[in-house]
Amino acid sequence: HNVGSLGNLAVETSRMENVEELRSYFDLNVFKVISLNTQFLKIFEEVEDRIIIVNITSLCAIKPMGGMAYYCSGKAAREMYFKVLADEKKHIKVLNYSPGPVETDMIGYVLEEAVNENLRDVFTSFKNQGTLLKPEITAKKCMKVLLAGKFSPGEHVDYFD
């Protein structure tokens, strides 16, 4: 599961009062993921012992980052859903994989839209120091983790682990 959007980076956490905007964010990033996963599991119920589910998560799911309340709370909710699924369905392999700072359009979006100065500084340093990961590099690491199979059910595994 790799759907994801950042949400509104122009609003401070203490000013998040647009309920429709919140609903829309959580609908895409949490509720639709749960719904899709539920339908998938219904269809493949007979082969559950061969199912591997990978949720693309973020360090933001477990560590708060000022200016990213939508993103952090959405990733945290989704990651917990998959941890509970792993606890209930012990024969399904579930991995919460955090790919690290990846060179995608997300970086530019944060630099343009974020009102939180510290957040912009963090992402600017990723970009300027060349620490952004190419998508294919972090995807290879995810595959290594999956093939090694040494992760606990629902575990959060970061690229840098």
Which ranges hold each PLM region?
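Conserved NAD(P)H cofactor-binding loop of Rossmann-fold oxidoreductase domains
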Residues: 2-10
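Catalytic Tyr-X3-Lys loop
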Residues: 5, 15-35, 78
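Catalytic loop of short-chain dehydrogenase/reductase
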Residues: 5-6, 19, 45, 50-77, ...
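Short-chain dehydrogenase/reductase
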Residues: 26, 30, 37, 41, 67-76, 82, 131-132, 139
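Amphipathic alpha-helical dimer-interface segment in Rossmann-like NAD(P)H-dependent oxidoreductases
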Residues: 27-49, 87
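C-terminal helical subdomain
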Residues: 96-99, 114-161
